[in-house]
């Protein structure tokens, strides 16, 4: 299995990415292709690691402040070269660089799966249950039609079933209430269409994402990104509050010591790094979009994520799902009249 890793554009430079690749190679068997500035990368690559990876040199990359359309023009940029390698035989690509450039090039260079109108970013959210919830779209499509959300539901369902091995995953539609009548026009129309699928649970509220009420939560990319960023902010704030309170007294420190195992589990469940990255579903190869601030652990987990996606043949499974399930979507006649 060949995995392409974009070295450029991340917040903390090439070192965390190289360390993540090195750790993953210690635990999994795969061929790594590193794309980026050789002069910046070489000082951090040991002789042992150098014998295990292929290095494709380029100094150009899409900076975070640049518009995503620049990636289409810059054929020597790291993400463009990486996407070309993926298109021409590699199995997966991971990038912690410009997410818009990654999404745009993936769609243009790899192509969309037949029947998919818009690819979506799929992310894992912490849950009180034993398994995380799947949320999509997490930011690829800010303005959506009901048909797009149907695509997201199908792709999320297949990802949960194939990659995460969830039995009979349930899909919920994010709304401002559980009742069928709740939601804006997009939610109401999507709800009518999703009724055609057995996996559809119904509307869910924001709090349900973390309760394990459903396995997959579907929403437009604007709302999904707000949910994602809010979750990250709340988790960070709670962590800071805990640290400050623990340091406030000897009694608190002793109590924290006794609860260390519980705190470790909490940290693991809420740490973005443990989830790796966010798969871009709906294109013809496996692409993982990692957080710009990714540390070595996040890159390592993103590689494991990519391996699982390739081994489960999730792209093929999504293709088959769209061939067999999507044509069955229709709004019930009574609902059409009501609308």
From Swiss-Prot:
Keywords: Cytoplasm, Lipid biosynthesis, Lipid metabolism, Phospholipid biosynthesis, Phospholipid metabolism, Transferase
Molecular function terms from GO: phosphate:acyl-[acyl carrier protein] acyltransferase activity
Name of the molecule in the record: Phosphate acyltransferase
Enzyme class, broadest EC rank: transferase
Pathway assignment: Lipid metabolism; phospholipid metabolism
Leader sequence residues: none
Pfam families: FA_synthesis (PF02504)
Similarity remark: Belongs to the PlsX family.
EC number(s) recorded for this UniProt protein: 2.3.1.274
Primary residence: cytoplasm
Subunit annotation: Homodimer. Probably interacts with PlsY.
Compartment(s) of residence: Cytoplasm
Gene Ontology CC: cytoplasm
GO BP annotations, alphabetical order: fatty acid biosynthetic process; phospholipid biosynthetic process
HAMAP family: PlsX
InterPro entries, A to Z: FA_synthesis (IPR003664), Phospholipid_synth_PlsX-like (IPR012281)
SUPFAM superfamilies tied to this protein: Isocitrate/Isopropylmalate dehydrogenase-like
Source organism: Helicobacter pylori (strain Shi470)
């Amino acid at each position: 299995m060949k995995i392409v890793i974009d070295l450029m554009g991340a917040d903390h430079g090439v070192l965390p990415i190289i360390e993540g690749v090195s750790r993953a190679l210690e635990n999994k068997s795969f061929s790594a292709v590193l794309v980026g500035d050789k002069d910046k990368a070489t000082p951090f690559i040991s002789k042992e690691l150098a014998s295990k990876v292929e290095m494709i040199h380029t100094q150009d990359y899409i900076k975070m402040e640049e518009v995503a359309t620049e990636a289409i023009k810059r054929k020597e940029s790291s993400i463009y070269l990486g996407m070309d390698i993926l298109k021409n035989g590699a199995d997966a690509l991971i990038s912690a660089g410009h997410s818009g450039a990654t999404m745009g090039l993936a769609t243009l260079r790899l192509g969309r799966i037949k029947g998919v109108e818009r690819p979506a970013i799929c992310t894992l959210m912490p849950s009180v249950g034993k398994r995380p919830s799947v949320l999509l779209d997490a930011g690829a499509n800010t303005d959506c039609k009901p048909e797009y959300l149907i695509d997201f539901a199908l792709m999320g369902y297949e990802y949960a079933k194939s990659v995460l091995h969830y039995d009979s995953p349930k899909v919920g539609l994010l709304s401002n209430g559980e009742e069928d009548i709740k939601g804006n026009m997009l939610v109401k129309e999507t709800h009518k269409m999703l009724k055609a699928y057995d996996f559809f649970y119904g509307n869910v509220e924001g709090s349900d994402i973390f309760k394990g009420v459903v396995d997959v939560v579907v929403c437009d990319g604007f709302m999904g990104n707000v949910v994602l960023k809010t979750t990250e902010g709340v988790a960070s704030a709670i962590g800071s509050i805990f640290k400050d309170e623990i340091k406030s007294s000897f009694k608190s420190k002793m109590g924290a010591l006794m609860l260390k195992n519980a705190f470790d589990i909490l940290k693991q469940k809420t740490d973005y790094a443990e989830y790796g990255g966010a798969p871009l579903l709906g294109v013809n190869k496996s692409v993982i979009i990692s957080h710009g601030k990714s540390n070595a652990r996040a890159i390592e987990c993103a590689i494991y994520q990519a391996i699982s996606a390739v081994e489960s043949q999730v792209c093929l499974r999504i293709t088959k799902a769209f061939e067999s399930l999507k044509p069955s979507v229709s709004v019930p006649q009574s609902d059409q009249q009501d609308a």
